[in-house]
Amino acid sequence: MAPQQKGKQGTKGAKQIVEENKTTLTFYRNMAIGCAAPALLLSFLVFEVTKTSVFMHILSLLILGSSYQFMAFMSQAKYSESGALLDSGNDLNMEGGIAENVKDLIILTSGTLLLALISNYFWLVLLLAPIRAGWMLWGSVIQPWLSQRNAQDDNPQVDEKKQKKMDRRMRRMR
């Protein structure tokens, strides 16, 4: 466990972000390939090949490939013609960013590929991804929107009460 830092976290320089993004991409690429290759080889050479297993392996490979490509696109650095760094791209290691969720998806899919070697019921673990996406959508978009609508409906009553109170005060002043 890392020791607690005192004070604010220091800001990262653009070159440091580019280097950390490269190492992060390399790590998650190696994780995806390191889990997918043995899982594919073992499942198709040792176990029975079914339509379900073929479909789930293709789906897993699509998830891994698209997640990695999304992270690579997101973190792409831009350089000037002279080779100077103009833009470091998005920081893949930023807490609370979308890259954190994409990395979780790669970890979930890689683990599912390996667990599916034990039992085909482990393919159901992939259902956690859309469940989490729905939960995040609910917490960040739908629920605040509904509570804002309810607050707007309650405000006219409060405004009417305040208006009556102000009217009474005005009458007393006259």
UniProtKB/Swiss-Prot annotation:
Membrane topology: Multi-pass membrane protein
GO MF annotation list: signaling receptor binding
Tissues/organs with expression: Expressed in the brain.
Chain ranges passing through the membrane: 30-50, 54-74, 111-131
UniProt gene name: Tmem208
InterPro entries in alphabetical order: SND2/TMEM208
Biological source species: Drosophila melanogaster
PANTHER family from the UniProt entry: TRANSMEMBRANE PROTEIN 208
Segments of this protein annotated with the region Disordered: 151-174
GO process terms (BP): protein localization involved in establishment of planar polarity; vacuolar protein processing
Gene knockout outcome: Results in lethality and the few escapers show a significantly reduced life span as well as defective leg, eye and wing development. Exhibit PCP-like defects in the eyes and wings and display a modest but consistent ER stress response.
Known partners and oligomeric status: Interacts with fz.
Cellular compartments annotated: Endoplasmic reticulum membrane
Family: Belongs to the TMEM208 family.
GO cellular component: endoplasmic reticulum membrane; intracellular membrane-bounded organelle; vacuole
Keywords: Endoplasmic reticulum, Membrane, Transmembrane, Transmembrane helix
Pfam family membership, one: TMEM208_SND2
Name of the protein: Transmembrane protein 208
